[in-house]
Amino acid sequence: MSCEAGPTDTQFWANFYTVEITSDECLSEVGSLLNCSSKITVARSLRGNEAQAFVDFLDRRGLRLLSKICKAQRIIPASYVLQGRSIRVRRAHGRGGFADVSNGKYLGCPVAIKRLRMHEGDSDRIFRRLCQEVVVWKHLSHPNILPLLGVSVSTDPHCFRILSEWMPNGNVMQYARSNPEVDRLQLLSEVVTGVAYLHKLKVVHGDLKGANILVDSAGTARIGDFGLMAMAGLSTIFLSETTDSFGGTVYWMSPELLDPQRFGSNGRPTCESDCYALGMVIYEVLTGLRPFHHLNAYPPVFAVLRGERPGKPLDAESLGFSDTLWELVQSYWSESSSARPTPQRLLDYLSDPSLTWVPPLVYPANGIDTNSDVSSSL
């Protein structure tokens, strides 16, 4: 391996900034760098935009490479693994769509413990995906992202547990119901900020909904449950109007996830499908109701594919839905994924200093809140 590098060795540094570089090439270049003192010296001497570009490359491509290796080899970095005997499970707290949830303690601190449910035939594939997703989640660091503390593993993949900080205020819907005076627009601004952070890193959440947005002790919204739907092998669902075996997730799913063949999709969550779900979260938080709440007997799969979307609330303005916000939310529900705005559009609106929150006197109840249960303007 050549160890000649200098400020004029433009090809070496150009490789680091090439978007199209493959994982094998990335590994080769990083190996070349780490095994060559002169190249390390050059790297340390970078300044300004060059230094930023180099750091961004390592951050972005290094994470991608690490996650791919972990998936291929069914391994997790040792620093992520928590000592099992230091974990104390106290009691079952709930049963989500794809995981059993308990609360407990790790080293004396309260934690949430999730055990992903896996079927025997799919356990190897799901475990590999889990290794990949955990690497990405552990890498994330943002005030509106739920921190991953680590994982507890054994030789049995069915015993794989994910540990995160315990959020005492529950999810955003529980918190809003318990605190009717809370500024829901501020909570939504925090959620959108978190999603924008993920998408900037090209990380897709894949299961955005109120139940997966938690609230910490300071009242700050934090997004959690990254990729659990995809990890569970549910990136594509069978069309069914009679079952809801996906933890209610179908109520937030975009058309291209519900019927990939029709929309030319591979059925995997994308930033665009996240944005569709984000629009549903806005509706959910401001109204206090699940999207398509009037469809109590079956999921809204066919309704969504017919172009139907939640109808405008009867008292939209009092709930925080200005005409501008309602039109914006509807744009996130576009049938065409490419027509959906990025989270920045919502951030621009929610960051307006003139925007104020006035709690409504009454929130919708029993699902009777709209002029019409669905709109079909798409």
Predicted ranges, named:
Residues L46-G84:
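Juxta-kinase regulatory segment immediately upstream of eukaryotic protein kinase catalytic domains
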Residues R90-G96:
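Protein kinase glycine-rich loop
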Residues D100-E120:
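Glycine-rich ATP phosphate-binding loop
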Residues P147-H158:
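Short beta-strand micro-motifs within the conserved protein kinase catalytic domain, predominantly
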Residues K200-V215:
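Catalytic-loop of the protein kinase fold
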Residues D216-Y251:
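Activation segment/activation loop of eukaryotic-type protein kinase catalytic domains
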